């Protein structure tokens, strides 16, 4: 078995595994929708003539984001709900949120570039949607959500809230990154995603920054260079693997 996709020369690879392993100058290899290898050793054994290779020199690689509390539009006609919800989900996808959980069954869908699942349980951790939520609770562990669909809330990205939590409230990097990747995956039974490990889904973001500290210290500039869902790069353009 050879890799269908390899990302090489990664400046910082945040796996979000149980030990929060971070590799420098690393690679990640995927076979179709699954990760088959990653680390700092030689990746050439995984390459054949059909392998697509992406160069992430100077860039950061992390698991794709997960939002566990999408409510969507409810106080409009059904046809308008479907249209507006699809538009909102697309906007969230462009900001790296490739898995979404909702308690609204009508929103459920699974497609090549984004999964929307029905949330079947409540979170044992606080869900932080606004600065005020964190200010009031000051939790040690939490899950971040855009809170889309709440009254007067049309937020499509984690970037603004994560900037505030990292820079104003001094939330440590591991807690913050896990709150939008591995912790929601673990909490809601999404055992196939949320971290970059062997046999996990290849849902991956490549960011135009050398470290996640740079990402959380930046606001107002798009930083996602590439997005990969189920091992297929689809943003900024499709690459067949």
Regions found by a protein language model. Give the residues of each.
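Divalent metal-coordination and catalytic microenvironments
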Residues: 10, 28, 33, 58, ...
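His/Asp/Glu-enriched, well-ordered alpha-helical/loop segment
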Residues: 135-206
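N-terminal metal-binding scaffold of metallo-dependent hydrolase/deaminase domains
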Residues: 1-47, 211-214
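Active-site loop-helix segments enriched in His/Asp/Glu that coordinate
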Residues: 79-123
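Short loop/helix-cap segments at secondary-structure boundaries that form the rim of catalytic
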Residues: 41-49, 107-110, 123-124, 134-138
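Hydrophobic faces of well-ordered beta-strands that scaffold small-molecule active sites
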Residues: 64-70, 100-102, 114-120, 126-129, ...
């Amino acid at each position: 078995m050879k890799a269908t996709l390899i990302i090489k020369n990664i400046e910082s690879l945040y796996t979000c595994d149980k030990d929060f392993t971070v590799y420098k100058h690393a690679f990640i290899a995927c076979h179709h929708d699954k990760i088959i290898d990653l680390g700092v050793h030689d990746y050439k054994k995984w390459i054949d003539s059909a392998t697509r290779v992406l160069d992430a020199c100077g860039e950061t690689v992390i698991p794709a984001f997960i939002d566990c509390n999408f409510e969507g539009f409810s106080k409009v006609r059904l046809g308008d709900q479907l249209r507006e919800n699809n538009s909102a989900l697309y906007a969230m996808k462009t900001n790296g949120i490739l898995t979404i959980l909702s308690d609204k069954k009508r929103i459920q869908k699974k497609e090549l570039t984004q999964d929307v699942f029905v949330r079947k349980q409540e979170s044992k951790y606080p869900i932080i949607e606004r600065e005020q939520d964190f200010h009031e609770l000051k939790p040690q562990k939490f899950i971040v959500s855009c809170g889309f669909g709440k009254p007067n809330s049309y937020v499509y990205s984690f970037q603004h809230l994560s900037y505030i939590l990292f820079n104003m409230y001094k939330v440590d990097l591991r807690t913050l990154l896990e709150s939008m990747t591995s912790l929601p995956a673990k909490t809601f039974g999404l055992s196939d995603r949320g971290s970059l490990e062997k046999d996990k889904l290849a849902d991956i973001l490549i960011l135009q920054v050398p470290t996640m500290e740079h990402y959380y210290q930046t606001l107002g500039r798009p930083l996602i260079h590439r997005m990969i869902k189920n091992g297929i790069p689809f943003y900024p353009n499709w690459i067949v693997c």
